[in-house]
Amino acid sequence: MTDEKREEGKRDFDRRTFIGAVAAVGAGAMLASCKKSYPPVKFVDLAPDGPVLKVGLVGCGNRGTGATLNILSAGPNIKIVALADVLKDHMDTCRANLAKKAKVQVDDDHCFIGFDAYKKVLDSDVDVVLLATPPHFRPQQFEATVDAKKHCFMEKPGAVDAPGVRSILASGQKATAYKLCVVAGTLWRHDRPHRETYNRVSNGAIGQILAARSRYNVGQLWYTPRKKGWSDMEAMIRDWLNWRWLSGDHIVEQCVHNIDTVIWFTGMHPTYAVGDGGRARRVTGDQYDHFNVQYAYPNGGVNDTMCRQIDGCTNEVSDLVLGTEGFTNCKDTIYDLNGKVVWKYQEEGQAPGKTKFNPYVQEHIDFVTAIRTNQPVNEAEHVAYSTLTAILGREAAYTGKKILWDEMMDSKERLGPTEYAMGPVDINAVVPVPGSSANAGRHVRTA
């Protein structure tokens, strides 16, 4: 048997096992009928024309540069006029990539360096701000963007802690009052196959939803070893993906995509989480490289979530939502309870399940379209709830305890320093260990 067929068989076995286990629980565990939790979107292939939209980018790393190229592809008359970052070499690389790939030149006097550089972007007569810094900074920068009455695209997640989530929610409400457009980086909501699958599930294609299963198991992403001459802050910023206070840990920074998909399809957030995790092979930073979390929903249903960033293991990025009449992978296919395909996404001129529309671009097409048609869309609340759900799972794993949604929402724990400068960072950078130690000889066997 080839590795591919062996893996396919394993996934099929896992699916059957999961469905059988959930079915044994019975109808009493049903979550609810899938309700629309997000306004239906009529996709367009390109945003309409209009007056020049002046865009400023905050965070010139790979994702920020990518988001800038994506919005330039979204429609006509879009111009990048300002850039901000704390690292000059990141700024220089971004400018070089924009010049090479999009023939974009940003004037020197509109390229700002420093922790307060985002404020200078907001003061530079932009219409739109793209926020792509490490997520620790998102709440503060989003609040300032809304206060400046600028439309905002912000990458996921919305925050790294509960105070940050509450800030995103408050700023989101203010954005609604100002009739601003806010789009988040939870891109599957802007992916055409996902959207059509969601529409069908909303209309009862799999019956009432019982449970879900999510996987984001991949290899290690990247890390940046500290170099001589770097301060604590510079070393952490350059290695931000591996530090809890900057990224939120990978269940928050990456697996939030799966978590958001399940919240979207079920139309509700969990009531509590239990879980575990650990650190087996991560090289830098202070966070885990694997999590297993079970989220419990109001009517007894569960979402079994697993994520891992370790090389040399079996990779899988998938979602499964199970209903009383079938199940779906959420992205392009619906099955009956026997595993027979009853529907698969089909786009004209494309293979089944495939789309020619890149969701990284589509989210910006939708964003610009909302701005130019004066039909504000605001995704702040849903990215905030998905972020808090991820944080809930993280803290359940860190502590080994059952943590309630309301308890997490009210948490006062804030990650990271309160002042930002290229120097020492006064935080307790220790990898979390759940439970209590086997101390005082309580577990010592004497004979």
Set out the residue ranges of the language-model regions.
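Glycine-enriched catalytic-core subsegment of oxygenase/oxidase enzymes
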Residues: 81, 98, 271-447
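N-terminal secretory signal peptides and thylakoid transit peptides that target proteins
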Residues: 4-25
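Beta-strand-loop-alpha-helix segment that lines the small-molecule cofactor/substrate pocket
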Residues: 135, 139-190, 204
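N-terminal Rossmann-like dinucleotide-binding module
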Residues: 26-102, 262, 442-447
